């Protein structure tokens, strides 16, 4: 069993195309998508058209949910540029995407955590903004009741693998389309990948257990940085250009 996991495309269709090409080059034919597909100051329509055409298993992210359950005037800074690009078909499709899924009986999929699509699972944020791996006992509490040996999540745009004490593995593949952002919950903090590459992971079930290969894929990130800047989001543009926002 071998497949690719993508997450957090955020409307970056050039990064998505580069990742899909790399997946094909690796001989992988199966894909799961962990959500946050379209929101951002980029090209929501092209990204969602491409994802809708994929033979993939999708779960919905918090930004996907906000596109379909909030009136426009209450949408956030990443939804407002994306929403006008989408038509009824895109939004209806997003409504069909579940919050969680099980892939081939062996893999549990969610965007952030099994119960909440907008909290961090594998990371903790200190009052001073420092980000560290969350304590194992806190991670394991949120994994209670999940029987699958592999658990996949996204949301934090941070590639990471955590082995639980019972042998299960939780993996975040990193973000395809957004290598950095700032956020104020639970405390003001900044996530920065340090390079502008598109990220995803290849998972393989071997006789010894799950193998994880984190992939960093270069693409025309400068073009997407220019688009973000043209759409008025200098922070997103900086992340796309360099992998850093400050």
Regions found by a protein language model. Give the residues of each.
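Beta-strand-turn-beta hairpins that frame and shape the catalytic cleft
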Residues: 1-4, 102-109, 164-168, 208-210
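N-terminal active-site segment of His-dependent metallophosphoesterases
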Residues: 1-56
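Active-site neighborhood of phospho(di)ester-bond hydrolases with catalytic His/Asp-centered motifs
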Residues: 6-7, 31-36, 40, 57-62, ...
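Glycine-rich phosphate-binding loop signature in dinucleotide/nucleotide-binding domains
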Residues: 23-28, 103, 144-147, 202, ...
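Active-site neighborhood of divalent metal-dependent phosphoester bond hydrolases
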Residues: 47-109, 115-147
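Active-site environment of divalent metal-dependent phosphoester hydrolases
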Residues: 10-15, 39-42, 64-69, 102, ...
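Anionic-ligand binding region
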Residues: 133-164, 168-173, 183
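Acidic, His/Gly-rich catalytic cores of divalent-metal-dependent hydrolytic chemistry
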Residues: 163-246
């Amino acid at each position: 069993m071998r497949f690719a996991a993508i997450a957090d495309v955020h409307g970056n269709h050039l990064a998505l195309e580069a990742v899909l090409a790399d997946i094909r080059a690796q001989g992988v034919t199966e894909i799961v998508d962990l959500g946050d597909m379209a929101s951002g100051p980029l090209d929501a329509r092209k990204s969602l058209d491409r994802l809708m055409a994929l033979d993939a298993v999708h779960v919905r992210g918090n930004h996907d949910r906000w596109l379909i359950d909030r009136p426009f005037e209450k949408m956030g800074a990443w939804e407002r540029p994306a929403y006008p690009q989408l038509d009824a078909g895109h939004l209806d499709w997003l409504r069909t995407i579940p919050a969680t899924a099980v892939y081939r009986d062996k893999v549990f999929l969610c965007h952030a955590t099994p119960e909440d699509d907008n909290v961090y699972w594998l990371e903790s944020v200190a009052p001073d903004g420092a980000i560290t791996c969350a304590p194992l006992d806190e991670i394991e509490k949120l994994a209670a009741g999940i029987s699958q040996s592999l658990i996949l999540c996204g949301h934090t745009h941070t590639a990471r693998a955590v082995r639980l004490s019972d042998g299960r593995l939780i993996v975040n593949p990193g973000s395809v389309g957004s290598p950095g952002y700032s956020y104020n919950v639970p405390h003001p903090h900044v996530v920065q990948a340090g390079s502008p590459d598109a990220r995803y992971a290849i998972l393989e079930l071997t006789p010894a257990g799950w193998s994880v290969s984190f992939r960093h894929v270069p693409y025309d990130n400068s073009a997407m940085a220019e688009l973000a800047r043209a759409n008025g989001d200098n922070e997103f543009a900086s992340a796309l250009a360099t992998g850093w926002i400050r």
